[in-house]
Structures are given as C-alpha cells and as structure tokens.
Design a protein with these regions (language model features):
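Glycine-rich phosphate/pyrophosphate-binding beta-alpha loops
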Residues: 267-276, 368-371, 381-393, 451-458
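Noncatalytic scaffold domains of N-terminal-nucleophile
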Residues: 21-37, 41, 49-214, 219-221, ...
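Extended C-terminal subregions enriched in glycine
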Residues: 426-428, 461, 470-517
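Internal maturation/activation junctions in enzymes
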Residues: 288-385, 537
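Bacterial N-terminal signal peptides
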Residues: 5-16
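Short, small/polar residue-rich loop motifs at catalytic or cofactor-binding pockets
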Residues: 253, 364-367, 431-433
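Active-site rim segments in enzyme catalytic domains, especially the processed small/beta chain
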Residues: 62-69, 73-88, 105, 239-242, ...
Length: 547
C-alpha cells in the first residue's frame, strides 16, 4: 500500500505535457490519485480499459465514499478500437416493487428535500457492481478477483483524508448519527476527520473480498443483501426495499445515442439518462452560430450556451424518463428539423426566458466520472454515483447506500397530466449523467469526457466539448474553464476568474444571473499525435496520468 500511495503522490495533474517524449499510449483520469494509480496498475499488467474501470471504481468507493461506490449505480460507454463500435451499459438504480408515485409526499405535500434524501425512501436497488460485472464478462482480460487487490489493501491499511472528503464530512455532520459511519469517518469526540488524517474501512475490505470471490450476486442474495433491505426498512422514515428487489435487479445493454457535430460524431447515453439527448440538442442548436468565432468567456458564447441549455432542459423535464415505462421520443428530440425549429427561439440579442417545465433547483454535489484508454485504444467513459454527498447517509458492509430515488419527480401529475419521471415500481429515475465519446468520420476515437455534479453534468460536459472541439483547447485547459450553465431557470456563472464580470452584461440581455461556487468533476482524455493527453477537474482531488 505504501508503494501505491508513493506512486500516486507523484502523478502529474495534467496530461500531455511530455515535451519531446512519445505521447502516452494509455491513460486514466479519475477523481482521486489512488484511484488513478489502481487503474494504471491494472493496465500495466495487461488489463483492458474495463478491467481498469473495475479497479478505479473499487478504489473510489474507499477514498471518495461521498460520491460513488458499491451502493450506487452508473452508466458506462465502452469503445472497441478493433471494431470501432460502442457498447452501452446501464447500471442505473431501480425503484423497489413497493415504490409508489406519492411516496415522497406527506399530507399531500412534498417532503422537504433533504428529509427525503436521508431516509429509507430514497434508496434504490444498486447497479454499479452488476454493470461492471457485465462489462468485464464481455471486455475484461484479467481475472475479476485480481482487480480488487489495490482497493482492499487501502481499505484495510488506511489512507489520508483528501480535502474534498474532509469538506463533505464537515458539511454533512448528520452522517455521524449513523453508527457504522461514525466509527470510520469521525473521531472519538464526534468531530469529523480532517484533511491528512487517516481512515481505514475494514468492513468495506471484507465486502470487496466477497465480491472479488463471488461477484455481484453478493449484493443480490445472502447476508449483505438482507442487511441492506433491513437497514432501509428499519429507518425512522422507512423505504420498501426488499431482498426480492435486490435479487431481481439486472443491468441493461442499450444502443448508443449518436449525432453529428461539425466534422465529428458525438455519442452518449440514451434514456433513462437525459445527458445524451441534451448534449446532442445543445450542440445542434449551437452549430450554426459557430462558436469558433468567439473566445472562452466572450459574452456571445456565454449567452448562446445558456440559451441552448434552457431549451434542452425544458425538453428534458417534459419528455425524458425510463424508456421501459414512458415512450421517450428520443430520435425526434435530436432530429435536425426539430432542432432547427427550436433554434428559432434563440436570439443573439435577448434571452428567451423560461421555457415550459422548469427543472427543480436542488444542486447535487455527488457522483464521480472516470475516463480510461488502454494500450490497444479501447476506452471507457463511466459516470458512477450514489447521488448526493454520502447518499442516503446509511451504511451497510462498509459502503454508503444511494439516495437515487430522489431523482424522480416529487409529484406524479402536473397540470392534470402524468409526469414522465414519476415514481414507479421497478422504474429507473431520470439521470443527467453524460459519459460521452467523440469520433471522427472514420469512427476513430477523438476524445472521451464526462462529469460529476447532478444536473450541472450536462452543461459542464457541453462546455468541455466546446472548449476542445471549437476552441481547440487541450483537455486540461478545457476542464479549467470557468463554467456557465442554464437549466431552464437562472443563468449560473461560476465565481471564478473574469466570468462574474459578465453578469451585468448578461442581465442586460434579459438573463436572471446567479454567481455561485461550482464543484465540477470533469475528466477527459483526448487524442494527441500518436497517443493521448488527459485532464482532471481542478475543482476536485482528481488527476490524469498516462504512460
């Protein structure tokens, strides 16, 4: 473990800085140095990009437990360099069979959001491990059990608390009321662990040892599954999760959602994620305005990006949900003719204001994204989550349970019509996760990108794409950009650099502007010469490293 930590501390924070040396032929970008080193260790041993993703996820569950882990879910894109095809894996959490459209109401009114989060009501059936098991079965090279060695070692021996983990432990102090979490993340006097203090999680090490030996069925049946169900049903605000729900869960393979942007093909996640639709819509809306004429942070670019986001989020709220329950008009929403009609609503001189259904205003700070390319050129873009910081704030087997069901709409009807994203038994809640590949016209991989950050994922990923494709920025420079976003409400400007200085000019165009802190969570890998460069969001603890 000491060797792993020492190597991780030497990792450069940006990719592609190598001067005259050959560009890296394999790359890992993730939210923590130890996770990056775990992935690289697998690649050095001849593992595939999917093998590395398993190792990275397991390590993130140890060192970034506030964002993702065994108790959550995610979406994974896999690029096969040999066939130039894309496989899509949906490991989104699902509502239990006992879920109802009114479960988040109390006396006919929505529960306070944070009360719903920290409750048994919010916990969905986790799917991250099942997703990884399916992807590994199809694209793994190393034995499944060999991919857990690094994370088990760190969980047993301990690791220093990162600045971001320390921040969220200080912020979510109610986590200390969970006995299992208190013994791991808090001191004897009840104070949260601080940056640099050491944490070990032997319970999680034991759970991972079982998963390494037996696979995802450990979470579907047996003692851990039974404990999950009992913990959720025994909460003071109980949910309905049952052992039968865990046993019935299956990840889903889907078709990628792809569309053109200038000379490239952009591919993302279809529903129940809204990310693929929204990003293709926004790129289609923006293409005729030719953002190459602008510089980053120019008023025109900020205005147009915000207006495109406004329209995409209006459609997201109205149409997008789990396609097993709702007929989502996916192809119509990204059709050139439809996008051209929507584009008529955009003026370069004035904001259009709110359009149709408005997205809820809660900002989610959880989730993690990894970007991996192996030596053969195969790639993974994997967005993984337990939803909010520390999910539902409950622990079983050393891992945090998700609060993913709060991604459903609170109300079942609006204006007398069913809401697409209403709660339903077995249904997967709508997501904003946006793992994205960009290919050239020969379907060779150009870049891979994705982000954490709840609904802000879509705008952050879009802005990174614009930075790399339109402004020809390096992967790291694109991720460093100050952020602008509009989710069919106020236009949000990050309180960074010279971006806040544009607030008054945007207000003159009719925008309601909020200047606020932003966490981000992007990672990216981009082709450079005969190799790759990488980037990791400077707002978090992550790095990108290639060899």
């Amino acid at each position: 473990m000491r060797r792993l930590l020492a190597l991780a501390l030497l990792l450069p924070i940006v990719g592609g800085q190598g001067g005259a040396r050959a560009e890296p032929q394999q790359m890992v970008a993730a939210a923590h140095p130890l996770a990056v080193e775990a992935g690289l260790d697998v690649l050095r041993r001849g593992g595939s990009a999917v093998d590395a993703a398993v190792a990275v996820q397991m390590m993130l569950g140890v060192v970034e437990p506030h964002s993702s882990g065994i108790g959550g879910g995610g979406f994974l894109l896999y690029y096969d360099a040999g066939t130039r095809g894309i496989a899509v894996y949906d490991g989104r959490e699902a509502a239990p069979a006992g879920a109802t459209p009114t479960m988040f109401l109390h006396d006919g009114r929505p529960l306070p959001f944070l009360d719903a989060v920290a409750s048994g009501l919010s916990v969905g059936v986790p799917g991250a491990v099942a997703l990884l098991e399916m992807a590994h079965r199809e694209h793994g090279k190393l034995p499944w059990a060999d991919l857990f060695t690094s994370s088990i070692g760190v969980a047993r021996k301990g690791f220093p608390v990162s600045p971001r983990l320390a921040f969220w432990l200080e912020t979510i102090k109610r986590l200390g009321s969970e006995p299992a979490a208190r013994t791991i993340y808090f001191n004897e006097d009840g104070s949260p662990k601080k940056t640099g203090e050491r944490i070990a999680n032997p319970a999680l090490a034991g759970t991972m040892e079982r998963i390494a030996a037996e696979g995802a069925r450990v979470l579907r049946e047996g003692p851990i599954a039974e404990e999950m169900a009992a913990r959720v049903r025994g909460h003071e605000r109980p949910g309905t999760l049952a052992a039968a729900d865990l046993a019935a869960y299956k990840p889903v393979k889907r078709e990628p959602l792809c569309g053109p942007y200038r000379i490239w093909i952009v591919c993302g996640m279809p529903p129940p994620s809204s990310g693929g639709i929204a990003i293709l819509q926004m790129l289609g809306l923006l293409e005729p305005f030719d953002l190459r004429k602008d510089k980053p942070n120019d008023l025109r670019a900020l205005h147009l990006i915000a207006e495109a986001g406004r329209l995409a989020f209006a459609d997201r709220a109205r149409y997008v949900a789990d396609p097993a329950f709702v007929a989502v008009p996916t192809r119509q929403l990204v059709a050139p003719g439809y996008i051209a009609e929507r584009r008529k609503l955009i003026s370069e001189d004035k904001s259009m204001g709110e359009q149709g259904p408005v997205a809820p205003g809660y900002v989610e700070h959880g989730t993690s994204h990894m970007t991996i390319v192996d030596r053969a050129g195969n790639a993974v873009a994997f967005t993984t989550t337990i939803e909010g910081p520390f999910g539902a704030q409950m622990m079983v087997g050393g891992f945090i349970l998700n609060n993913e069901l709060t991604d459903f709409s609170e109300v079942a009807e609006r204006d007398g019509k069913p809401v697409a994203n209403r709660v339903g038994p077995g249904k997967r809640p709508r997501s904003s996760m946006s793992p994205t590949f960009v290919l050239d016209r020969e379907r060779k991989l150009v870049l891979s990108v994705g982000s954490a950050g709840g609904q802000r994922i879509i705008g952050d990923t879009l802005q990174a794409l614009v930075g790399m494709l339109d402004w020809n920025l390096s992967a790291q420079a694109a991720l460093d950009l100050p952020r602008v976003a509009n989710m069919n409400g106020p236009t949000e400007l990050e309180d960074k650099g010279d971006l806040p200085a544009q607030a008054d000019a945007l207000r003159k165009l009719g925008h309601q502007v909020q200047v606020r802190r932003h966490e981000g969570g992007l990672t990216a890998v981009r082709r450079k010469g005969d190799g790759w460069e990488g980037g990791a969001d400077p707002r978090r603890d992550g790095v990108a490293k290639g060899e």
